[in-house]
Amino acid sequence: MSITKVELREDVGEELKVYSPDQEMSADVAARIDKSIRRARAMLIEERLCWWGENAIPEQCAIPLTWIVAALACTKFGKAGQGYEAGEERGKARLAKLKTPTDITTLQPDPF
């Protein structure tokens, strides 16, 4: 099973407490989270920790990826220094445990 980018955006919004499932996410909040999702994915591809498609995130990667994106997005919402930053390393460590040798060859970084 997998989750979509929209589901990841909602998970990050809930993690940062800037979104509640019973309300619609504002376009501004969505745009700020989406920017962090794009940057996190690019970084993880470069570090060979991303082996999934942009809109087909393996279910087992959802929590670590949420932690990573929240760590990158927290400053955009005035949440720096509240512990979210630790999620980046924690999430990367979890993704490294999840990947298999065949996973890491699926996506390659784009050359500059």
Regions from the language model: what does each represent?
Residues 77-82:
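Charged, low-complexity interaction regions
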